[in-house]
Amino acid sequence: MTRSIQQDRSIEKSEAKTANFNQESIFKIDELFFSRTDNRGVIEAFNSVFSRISEHADDALRGAPHKVIRHSDMPKAVFWLIWDTLKAGKPITGYVKNRAKSGRYYWVYAVIAPVDGGFLSVRMKPTSPMLATVAELYKKILRLEREDGLSPEKSAAVLLQEIRSMGFDDYMDFQAHALVTEFQARENALGRTPFNALTNAIRVAEAERMICDKIASITDELAQGAIYILNMKLQAVKLGRDRAAIDAISNNYDLILGDIKSGITRLKSIMSDASTSNFSSRKESQILLCASSIMAEVVQNFDQGDEPMTTEERERESVYLRNLHAAFSNKSTASVSAMMDECRQVLGRMDSLRQTLLGLSAVRVSLRVETNRLGERARGLDSLISEIDQSHQRVRNDLEQMFETASHFSSAITAS
């Protein structure tokens, strides 16, 4: 009889969990929760919000593997990517669907980072339209895992491929966009003033993209310069004894064009160095700024909250939280400093290019004067001068737009 009652209770619990499977646990947008694990993923500490949402008793959570809250809707690819990044000593962020003890689900946007002796994860409630997109993506990846028997690593490769097909360069690009989107959605929902440092970092990224596009445009335009020089020399040959002045002008044009090309190459190098360095990456800057702000709020909530911990445990966890906040804050500060240094270099290089372009203008004037002097004998140069004028104007316009953008770039950084 006792065995039958236990079986009945087990069946009742199973049915209750099944009934709750499509119900969402209450996770308020103004809440944040954290958990800290050892290097194996065993839970060592957490706050009261985590235990309430997960519906597990505090004693049951301590010492339990973090996968105790894993939802069956989550593809293994996501966890492979998370662990692969964490083992490399790098933080990672992303969407995760968790399962409460009752069977209810709750979505989180997690910021996870290595800490001394393990890992610390902070979660906020995702509310942007990105969540629906990611939920569908996870369903697709999960289906492939089950139908094709993909290993977690191969599934992660498919996940990254899908992310690239969505228009992102890589996971860094994706997570920066996702975190910023969720962070700003949360800030707006809570009625907070815009986070100026983040807004400016986004503008800087947009400015850099525009500058890189203009550099490519100028590079293409300068490639035509060799054709103009060749045509000048060909026209000079036709002039016979009167060719000396045109030859000299074409040589000067060639020299100045070479200086401009060198300046553009150095500018490209500055932009390339900025995009490949660790903490001058604009996308990473945005992640760091969001993470720093989130951690500051977690620390404040922890200090003011009534957590299920002894005084000794509170002091220990406070150190973990403050250290991670300091790490994110220091790295975001370093990133802003790198942006300021890059900005100074970019503006300096552009100013030099503007001066060099004035020299090219002088050569164009000389060519026009000499063409007018030669009259009918230099008739073939008229159309060439027109082409050079148009090309010069395009380069000038691109350069001025770059300079204006870089100036706004500088103002945004200074305001940060």
Regions found by a protein language model. Give the residues of each.
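Sensory coupling linkers of modular signal transduction proteins
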Residues: 117-191, 195
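Membrane topogenic helices and adjacent juxtamembrane segments
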Residues: 1-20, 165, 176-183
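Acidic, serine/threonine- and proline-rich intrinsically disordered appendage/tail regions
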Residues: 311-315
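Intrinsically disordered, low-complexity acidic Ser/Thr-rich regulatory segments
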Residues: 316-340
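Sensory/regulatory domains in signal-transduction proteins
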Residues: 7, 12-143, 200, 205-207, ...
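Short, charge-rich amphipathic alpha-helices with coiled-coil/heptad character
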Residues: 186-204, 326-335
